[in-house]
Amino acid sequence: MSEYSMPRYFQNMPEIGEPTYGPDPENEQQLKATEAEFKELIEKILAAGRSDESLNSTGQLTAMQRIRALVDEGCWYPLNSLYNPAGNANGSTNIVKGLGRIGGRWAVVVASDNKKAAGVWVPGQSENLLRASDTAKTLRIPLIYLLNCAGAQLDVQEKVYPNRRGGGAPFYRNAELAQLGVPVFVGIYGTNPAGGGYHSISPTVLVARDNANMAVGGTGILSGMKPKGYVDQETAEALIKAQTEGPKVPAPGSMNVHHDITGFVREVYPDDQGVVEALKKYVSYLPAYNLEYFRVADPCEPAYPASDLYDIIPTDQKIFYDVYQVIARLFDGSCFQEYKKSYGPEMITGLARLDGLLVGVVANKQDFLMNYPEYRGEDAIGVGGKLYRQGLIKMSEFVTLCARDRIPIVWLQDTSGIDVGDPAEKAELLGLGQSLIY
């Protein structure tokens, strides 16, 4: 497609940027070392727990194998890979999540990490799940669970269930998304008692593997129910004997119950891959916009290679860099239509194209600003990266205009914060900063 609306505005934006003066091997090496460090941390967390071979030998796929089978090749973008607010020993919240494209349609995907204690709920997992549902709600795209959750880790359950953003909040959020018309799908694997059971039942479309189950309580609870109302030594010994020597209590809530009788589960499959294919099918039924509808120009590469960023952005945070050179290596054709360039010089705002789509850009300029800000007098020297009165006003205006026209914003944030002191208070920076929040 080559015919678009308003070409004089969107296809003829000014070009910015210039070639770099030359490579900076030391800076590049330091940045790549930092990238490698993060990559190693993420890989270590994903590898922790039961081995892939051990799970595969039982006919199960791992969380990442299920994700790769579900999303289009090359279209998986992890989110919050290092998020571990409670400091769990394995470095994670026992879920893997991210944005993925499924048959060309975007979705938020959350997979129970069955390598780690059968995907049990651990402290911090609820908050991580809410981040996923927040993303689905904001973008209005499907939320898909690949669920394999053995309930809560009992020795820390007091840190899992309580609070308004604790264990029950994700189930409320699933209901909220359904009311908003945002689809919530789940593929159910393994044993899912208690918190795992509610997690199974709260989405709107349920598909499952034939050996999966979901229940209010698991076999441990069934085996432990005694009329005394308390556990003494005699009861404890009987429980141990029943678990080690006696007949096993069948796991409640099998697919014979929840597919054949209750009808909660729509479809059942004999292997993990079948569940994945069913989820793909239901995603394909959903309406979706063609991106061509939103494009303002044909997609094209930036005029300068992204690899230049290793030379442009210094590892030493005391060294200024030219953020225009960064913008020139991120957006189509290195084109950028700036908004109010001479006003609020510590902030750069404007329009650019990304894959032919119109986006707003907000960035912190890095430089000394002579005789600025104006409220500090003629001899003032402002520092790039700090927020002053004019920059806050410009940002507020630009963000408001983008919100009005439903233009997404790319924010290149590199700031030391807002200006402080009585001159800043008299210049109303507190109120101007608040205007960005609402």
Predicted features and spans:
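Short coil/turn connectors at secondary-structure junctions
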Residues: 93, 103-107, 138-142, 179-184, ...
